[in-house]
Design a protein with these regions (language model features):
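Polybasic, glycine- and aromatic-enriched phosphate-binding surface used to engage nucleic acids
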Residues: 84-97, 136-138
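Short, ligand-facing micro-motifs at secondary-structure edges
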Residues: 62-75, 94-97, 101-118, 134, ...
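Non-catalytic DNA-recognition/assembly elements of restriction-modification systems
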Residues: 2-40, 168, 172-202
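Well-ordered mid-protein domain cores that form the structural environment of catalytic cofactors
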Residues: 141-144, 150, 170-172
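A short glycine-rich beta-alpha junction/loop motif
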Residues: 98, 114-122, 134, 154-183
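Sequence-specific dsDNA recognition surfaces
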Residues: 27-46, 59-91
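Ligand-binding loop in jelly-roll beta-barrel domains
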Residues: 111, 125-132
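A structural connector/turn signal
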Residues: 83-84, 110, 156
């Protein structure tokens, strides 16, 4: 059973007074992380279409927390080194789409040796003394967080969220043991979905 303030599959604000009891608190996004980087766009830095490594942009992050590698461009080793100096992506980082649809994110669980990211993706490294990456990734995919973040989007054609506005967005933060419970509940759901998909693929 998920905690108060959380509905199965989605987070939902019930009221600050209730959420702020029993160790719950509200922090600014900037207080929960150690660093936020972006990837790099080609421009004069490198070119796409060469090599076998994958170049990930906002369109490749799905609503299910996965990366769709079937629709990505390709880069070579040199381009990846150039991008990585800026992105510095590693296991435990959260990839977050800064462009609409806001809220598509992915938690890196395996070494990202065969891909790197463009400027439309933020790479977020949490402060693990404060928040678990699993919890923050789930929270950033929630309807509540997406609504709050979308209040600050800019652009009439392609909506984007600026780093400064993201940093100022509220994060509802339960105690660490509650974060673990929430994350584990969703992991069990994800494992069940993955198993069902595997069974369906073999039918």
């Amino acid at each position: 059973m998920l905690t108060d303030g959380i509905r199965m599959g989605r987070f939902s604000m019930i009221g600050n007074e209730r959420l702020l009891t029993n160790g719950w608190q509200i922090l600014k996004f900037s207080e929960c992380i150690k660093q936020l980087n972006t990837g790099l766009n080609p421009r004069n830095h490198f070119s796409l279409g060469h090599g076998s490594l994958k170049y990930i942009t906002a369109k490749n992050l799905t609503q299910f927390g996965t990366i769709d590698f079937s629709k990505c461009d390709f880069i070579d080793e040199q381009a990846k080194r150039i991008i990585h100096r800026r992105s510095d992506i590693q296991v435990g980082d959260i990839l977050f789409s800064s462009r609409a649809p806001i809220g598509h994110c992915h938690l890196i669980c395996e070494k990202p040796d065969d891909y790197d990211i463009g400027e439309s993706i933020f790479s977020i490294r949490v402060d693990r003394k404060i928040i678990l990456p699993d919890y923050l990734c789930l929270y950033m995919a929630s309807d509540y967080f997406v609504r709050m973040a979308s209040l600050h989007t800019t652009g009439s054609i392609i909506q984007e969220i600026r780093i400064s506005d993201l940093m100022d967005t509220d994060v509802i933060l339960p105690p660490m043991n509650e974060q673990r419970r929430i994350a584990e509940c969703f992991k069990k759901i994800d494992r069940k979905i993955a198993l069902n998909n595997k069974i369906n693929d073999n039918l």
